[in-house]
């Protein structure tokens, strides 16, 4: 999966550059490849080291966005997978909670700072900023709500997967116990 996402990230970056994301059609190929590698390679170890992978992917995503790498979609997928995996595979629930809350806090802090910088930057281009619910404010609210849904969904689905896995393990243990009891009962009946 990590390799497929790497190839997709490279293609998405090239297409994003052609499409003019960030109003630029130029991209340093080395930066794009480094971003794609740092973003996707850790996912190969997501079940073995889920917390480390989630932090690494989050840092790579942040760095790529700050460097204005024109790749928006695979980064979101990789971040979702890494974040979800913490909830799904970390047995220490306190650690899973703390890692996910730290990532959420970091991302929302970055989002709010970016919004503030963007809102206070003088510009004649882009969305109108006039009025309480200007197109610009509406766009910023959409960004905020999408991030709430994104992280909330990954958090919820990760927890549900963990609980389902735990219930299956308990059911398997009970099945083994039941089989032992049947064998004991059968041996006593003879």
Predicted regions and their residues:
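N-terminal signal-anchor/first transmembrane helix of integral membrane proteins
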Residues: 1-54, 144, 158-164, 169
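Structural signal for membrane-spanning alpha-helices in multi-pass inner-membrane proteins
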Residues: 9-16, 43, 61-68, 110-114
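Juxtamembrane/transmembrane-helix boundary motifs at the membrane-water interface
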Residues: 13-29, 65-71, 117-135, 139
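Subset of alpha-helical transmembrane segments and adjacent helix-loop junctions
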Residues: 27-30, 50-56, 63-79
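Hydrophobic, membrane-inserted alpha-helices
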Residues: 35-42, 56-64, 79-83
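Central hydrophobic cores of alpha-helical transmembrane segments
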Residues: 52-63, 97-107
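Cytosolic coiled-coil signaling helices that couple upstream sensory modules
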Residues: 76-184
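Histidine-centered phosphotransfer motif of kinases
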Residues: 184-190
């Amino acid at each position: 999966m990590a390799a497929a996402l790497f190839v997709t990230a490279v293609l998405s970056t090239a297409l994003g550059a052609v499409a003019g994301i960030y109003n630029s059609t130029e991209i340093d190929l080395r930066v794009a490849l480094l971003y794609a590698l740092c973003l996707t390679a850790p996912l190969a170890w997501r079940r073995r080291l889920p917390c480390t992978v989630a932090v690494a992917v989050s840092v790579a995503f942040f760095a790529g966005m700050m460097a204005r790498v024109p790749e928006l979609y695979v980064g979101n997928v990789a971040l979702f997978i890494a974040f979800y995996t913490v909830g799904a595979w970390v047995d220490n629930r306190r650690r899973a909670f703390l890692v996910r809350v730290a990532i959420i806090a970091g991302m929302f802090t970055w989002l709010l700072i970016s919004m503030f910088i963007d809102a206070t930057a003088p510009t004649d281009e882009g969305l109108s900023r006039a009025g309480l619910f200007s197109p610009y404010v509406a766009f910023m609210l959409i960004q905020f709500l999408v991030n709430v849904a994104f992280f909330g969904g990954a958090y919820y689905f990760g927890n549900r997967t963990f609980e389902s896995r735990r219930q299956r393990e308990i059911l398997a243990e009970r099945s083994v116990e039941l089989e032992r009891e049947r064998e004991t009962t059968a041996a006593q009946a003879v």
